[in-house]
């Protein structure tokens, strides 16, 4: 077997280069033709039944309104009841024929079975599943005292998606539906303090890429990798090393610095267009793709830059990180050049 591997090691790079030179241009032309057809004959979701998890805020909320505008029936899921009912009422005002709000915890297997079953019993079908619920643990791995407190990242971000998909897939297959996976650019790009978040999103991407191969044409899978989108997370709501959700704006400033925050509405519109076209992937905004390319071809440099920007020198406080100093300069610049409005 070792000799076979040696032969493959020699031949495969040559065959790969040949394939790229000969077949890649044709492949891209075919992709362009398919993309044009998908734009011309995009899916009409009016009258279809859509389940959205994490629908009480952020991308999930904005997607509920986008689906509502297009006339879809909605089953909205979130662990927070009051904001969920508010979103459900607004989604109906936006045009959804009927909205079913369901309070549930996606990290619990029984809850996922319950809300999928309730959706199918109520509407009689299921066409789209949007797995959006997630939390963002934000701390250094070395600071953890009890590693079991890190489990919510996988329980919610990964297993929450898996559980929903397990119970929804028979119905999605029956109606040739689609799974819309809200992953993250962090699933491709490592970032200090986000080890568990990055790991959970990378697992989500790998899981659904594998499922797409298994499902074939029976169930479509669109994997979305957003950048920083206006949400509770982008406003500083993170999970601590003790497993508690807190708002820490100072930590938010260090971690996100001057990176642009995209509105949830803009992101949801891009996702909606991508879903209706039947896209396999969506990187939103587009510059996320450039960062991923830099990581692939200059991985050492991107890791060094992330550490240089986001981690303060030893024995210095967190706020001494270069990312926070850049933000301070940006604030000072804005204050200096701002003019009163009359």
Swiss-Prot record:
It is a single-pass type II membrane protein. InterPro entries: NAD(P)-bd_dom_sf, Sc_DH/Rdtase_CS, SDR_fam. Its EC number is 1.1.1.-. Its main location: membrane. The keyword Repressor does not apply. It is found in: Membrane. The chain crosses the membrane at residues 10-30. Belongs to the short-chain dehydrogenases/reductases (SDR) family. PANTHER family: 11-BETA-HYDROXYSTEROID DEHYDROGENASE-LIKE 6 (PTHR43391:SF69), RETINOL DEHYDROGENASE-RELATED (PTHR43391). This is 11-beta-hydroxysteroid dehydrogenase-like 6.
């Amino acid at each position: 077997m070792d000799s076979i591997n040696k032969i493959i090691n020699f031949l495969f790079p040559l065959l790969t280069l040949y394939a790229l030179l000969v077949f890649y241009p044709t492949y891209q032309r075919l992709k362009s033709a398919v993309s044009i057809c998908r734009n011309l004959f995009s899916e009409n979701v009016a009258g279809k039944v859509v389940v959205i998890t994490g629908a009480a805020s952020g991308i999930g909320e904005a997607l509920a309104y986008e689906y509502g505008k297009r006339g879809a029936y909605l089953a909205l899921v979130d662990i927070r009841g009051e904001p969920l009912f508010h979103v459900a009422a607004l989604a109906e005002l936006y045009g959804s024929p009927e909205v079913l709000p369901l309070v549930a915890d996606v990290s619990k297997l029984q809850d996922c079975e319950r809300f999928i079953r309730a959706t199918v019993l109520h509407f009689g079908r299921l066409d789209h599943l949007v797995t959006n619920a997630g939390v963002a643990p934000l701390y250094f791995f070395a600071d953890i005292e009890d590693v079991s407190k890190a489990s919510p990242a996988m329980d919610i971000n990964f297993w929450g998606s898996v559980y929903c998909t397990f119970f929804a897939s028979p119905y999605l297959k029956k109606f040739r539906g689609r799974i819309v996976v809200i992953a993250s650019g962090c699933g491709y790009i490592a970032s200090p303090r986000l080890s568990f978040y990055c790991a959970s999103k990378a697992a989500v991407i790998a899981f659904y890429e594998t499922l797409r191969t298994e499902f074939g044409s029976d169930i479509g899978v669109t994997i979305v990798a957003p950048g920083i989108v206006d949400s509770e997370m982008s406003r500083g709501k993170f999970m601590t090393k003790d497993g508690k959700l807190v708002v820490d704006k100072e930590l938010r400033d260090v971690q996100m610095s001057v990176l642009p925050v995209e509105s949830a509405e803009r992101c949801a519109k891009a996702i909606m267009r991508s879903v209706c076209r039947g896209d396999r992937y969506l990187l939103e905004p587009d510059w996320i793709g450039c960062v991923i390319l830099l990581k692939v071809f200059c991985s050492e440099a991107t890791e060094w830059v992330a550490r240089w920007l986001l981690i303060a020198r030893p024995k210095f406080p967190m706020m001494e990180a270069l990312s926070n100093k850049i933000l301070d300069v940006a604030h000072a610049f804005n204050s200096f050049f701002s003019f009163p409005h009359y």
